[in-house]
């Protein structure tokens, strides 16, 4: 293993011990601070993002790939608001999930939620994942090692600076969130081979990325593969609300892996109501097969 990645793993290990000392309120304060730094450094983030977008266009990346890269003033504001929402969530830790007893000897058992530990997150061209993933890991008391795609490295670096500044501002270990800044794919392999040092890998991206990680990881993974997201229009649901939900699910950001690809419609809906919903999609250039 390279000295560079070995250092990241050591930082993550120490950070996991420091993370265990934090209260739910401490973790909420971190997230609120991150939100504030995102807004305060918005222009720097946008400038870095423009570098990534320009480079992507020079490399003739596909339009959907370029669209995934783009951040705007509004998107950064929304990202900051999303972090605040995560900060306000109920603490997921130390919750009693199940309880039972042994009737023979009277022993009491409880299943309680605890952090996983160190989570490696590998993702492609959506820079907002840097903030989403880090925030969710912080809220749940986990240290994260983030490895984004090379196509959005400038944006990710700037976003990570916001995270580190937020942690340092609170006089906390800045490596509660770690970031693989080197874009060499060899470091992805090192992350996948870090058995015993990384507790789980969560990939977020296209089929080829997920398959590569599945085939090569010695660390347990939490993954999807094919995508093919479904939306179900069930019996008794009004066509107006169905149209709104289906429109959003498919057309809000059609280039992302979470966009609806399959629509299942209950047989009770009339042909006229179905046409009402599908015509809306067709009018926006969506092909119905």
What do the predicted segments below correspond to?
Residues 125-128, 132-143, 162, 166-169, ...:
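ALDH superfamily catalytic-core signature
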Residues 191-200, 215:
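Active-site/ligand-binding-proximal alpha/beta "capping" segment
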Residues 85-89, 93-166, 170, 217-221:
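Conserved small-residue-rich beta-alpha loop and adjacent elements
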Residues 146, 178-181, 202-205, 221-224, ...:
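General beta-strand structural signal in soluble alpha/beta enzymes
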